[in-house]
Regions:
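Catalytic cores of TIM-barrel enzymes
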Residues: 1-206
Length: 206
């Protein structure tokens, strides 16, 4: 399959932004409808990687996404890399269920705030409630572990989170400069599930 060439990324970015503005605002008829990818994990599989292989190697994730853009030339992505497998694994795992045989990913839906805990949340505050209730409930921290062991797991997860943040930042920067792709449609440069979830939204499940 022939790959697209990107000789004028800055001009292409300007064109893409104009297309999106015209389409969303409706002030004038767009030259064409911009194409937004919600491909999620498909670029990884399309590049011949297994899911776990790419989740555990951000260079492979980058290569797969770059190949995908060169083949299909989307105007926008809802996100580039949202998979925090190594982060949740450092906390004890269980956040993502990956089946390489079927090429599927499932997220475990959990109630992090139980029915009778609203008063506790108000009394304890979000930070204390998160560390004393949510982390043990979601990741098993504190169950059969010393405080030092639990803190070591949290530190490891934060290290993995920083690596994921750096990989995502690299992808956003390089894809803008090389392919003329703007910031993704999410408020943050790239959306991904983190161990410190947006728990205001996720406390009571998906």
């Amino acid at each position: 399959m022939e790959r697209y060439t990107f000789d004028d990324p800055a001009g292409l970015l300007k064109e893409r932004m104009q297309l999106m503005n015209d389409t969303v605002r409706g002030d004038k008829k767009p030259k064409r409808i911009p194409i937004c990818s919600q491909s999620r994990a498909f670029p990884l599989l399309d590049a011949g990687y297994s899911l776990l292989e790419a989740f555990c190697d951000y260079d492979k994730t980058y290569d797969a996404m770059a190949r995908f853009q060169e083949l299909y030339n989307y105007d926008f992505y809802t996100d580039y890399s949202r998979f925090s497998y190594l982060v949740t694994e450092a906390l004890g795992g269980g956040g993502m269920v990956v089946d390489d045989g079927k090429g599927t990913i499932n997220y475990v839906d959990e109630l992090l705030l139980l029915d009778g805990e609203y008063d506790d949340l108000i009394e304890m505050g979000m930070d204390r409630f998160f560390f004393e209730r949510v982390l043990p409930r979601k990741y098993g921290l504190g169950k059969g572990k010393t405080t030092e062991e639990a803190l070591a797991m949290i530190n490891k997860a934060m290290e993995e989170q920083h690596k994921l943040d750096a990989a995502n930042a690299k992808m956003v920067k390089n894809f803008k400069e090389k392919y003329g792709l703007g910031k993704t449609t999410n408020a943050s440069p790239c959306f991904y599930k983190t161990p410190v979830d947006v728990i205001e939204c996720n406390l009571r499940g998906l």
